[in-house]
From Swiss-Prot:
Protein name, as recorded: Putative peptide import ATP-binding protein BRA0405/BS1330_II0402
InterPro entries: AAA+_ATPase (IPR003593), ABC_Ni/Peptide_Import (IPR050388), ABC_transporter-like_ATP-bd (IPR003439), ABC_transporter-like_CS (IPR017871), Oligopep_ABC_C (IPR013563), P-loop_NTPase (IPR027417)
Amino acids binding ATP: 43-50
SUPFAM superfamilies for this protein: P-loop containing nucleoside triphosphate hydrolases
Alphabetized Gene3D superfamilies for the sequence: P-loop containing nucleotide triphosphate hydrolases
Protein's membrane topology: Peripheral membrane protein
Protein species of origin: Brucella suis biovar 1 (strain 1330)
Family: Belongs to the ABC transporter superfamily.
Subcellular localization: Cell inner membrane
GO function terms (MF aspect): ATP binding; ATP hydrolysis activity
General function of this protein: Probably part of an ABC transporter complex that could be involved in peptide import. Probably responsible for energy coupling to the transport system.
Amino acid sequence: MSRQPILDIKGLRTVFRTRAREIVTVNDVDIVVNPGETVALVGESGSGKSVTSLSIMRLLARKVGFIDAGSIILRGKSGQTVDLAAIDEEAMRRIRGNDIGMVFQEPMTSLNPVYTIGDQIGEPLRVHRGTSRREALEAAVELLDRVGIPDARRRAGQYPHELSGGMRQRATIAMALICNPTLLIADEPTTALDVTIQAQILDLMQKLQSESGMGMLFVTHNLGVVAEIAQRVVVMYAGRIVESGPVKEVFRNPRHPYTMGLLRSMPRLGDATEMKRRGEKLNTIPGMVPGLANLPSGCAFAPRCSFAVEACHAAVPPLASVNEHHGSRCIRWQEIAA
């Protein structure tokens, strides 16, 4: 299998317009996704994760959000590369649902309530390949069966409200994969599901990925999910990448205080009883994510950081190389240990 990247983002900068000013929501973001690889994009709400994924798909609100700088190079099914940041909307329509599939957080809002499940899953085939409605429906039924929906033919004739939350999410996964994309973007696809269904959906996505060899950008705030599904992790804070590297290395040896704070605030099995016995509380990160319209000077995390020194407030730190595969946007990364 070719190791040329499926997705290669360099220097992505996304801006939102307000009546008063322009606000940078994603700043200088670099992400690479290889064939068969899952890269997790993590951070608190407001960190820029979802705006990054919407920028890749060019689904930003018109006249409000726009890509101001950078490139988004996609290697499609033909093997040819295209810069998604530079093409027009007509060209982008030929790529969405064909070379790139996307699974959204809440399936009830991403599925159309007035069309049957089968029609919605089959629509990308009709749009991109000119498949007949009957052939598209047969393909949809087959894929519904593959994603684990029982009695797939009957379910294909039903409407979204007639399916459970887990079934709806399986249907949106089927819709995203119907054209065999090279890249799947999954934006918090398991957040609205209970833990049992969440585990089933994660297993399903890994199985389908191993069968197709597609790359996956998995957007989440759940580090437990990251440990299970991803090979590399990109941590975002206030619109910038603050740490990136192999999941095992970053989790074992985080080199940014924000990553360390996220990991330490994760509850672990057995912790509650032991912490109660000791009279301890769950670790938290003090403060809140700053508003992107009013970022502090220097490192945006400095006001919440126990490692911060005067120099942290002077300038935005560069993304330093911890090693060939691991980067940290912290001037004190060498002093930080988990």
